[in-house]
């Protein structure tokens, strides 16, 4: 028998969570499909451009929003490259019910996954505390180096 899973949270192998990430997210999952927390970044040598988390770009305050509010903010702030994998916790039963999976062998699968996940949600908990550190490194698909 497969274990009972309440929530799922993703992490890239070169990133890390704050020690209290899970403990902070679980109580906020009550009545929502997703908890969206903030991220900060660490740049490897050679990166000069700035990176801001999507949550900072949306400038949302802590609390529950409807999916429609997220969509309206996306349109009003002209945020067309939305991605979501490692910046939140997802209700696992909800994820199974909507049958959303990552697309194999394509770049930026987190964009497709994130947009569909948020579009199908009813409620999203905005948690503007930085619970995740994102390491931007050489040869990353984000490619923020000056050699663009």
Task: Name each model-derived stretch.
Residues 1-148:
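Nucleotide-sugar donor-binding/catalytic module of glycosyltransferases
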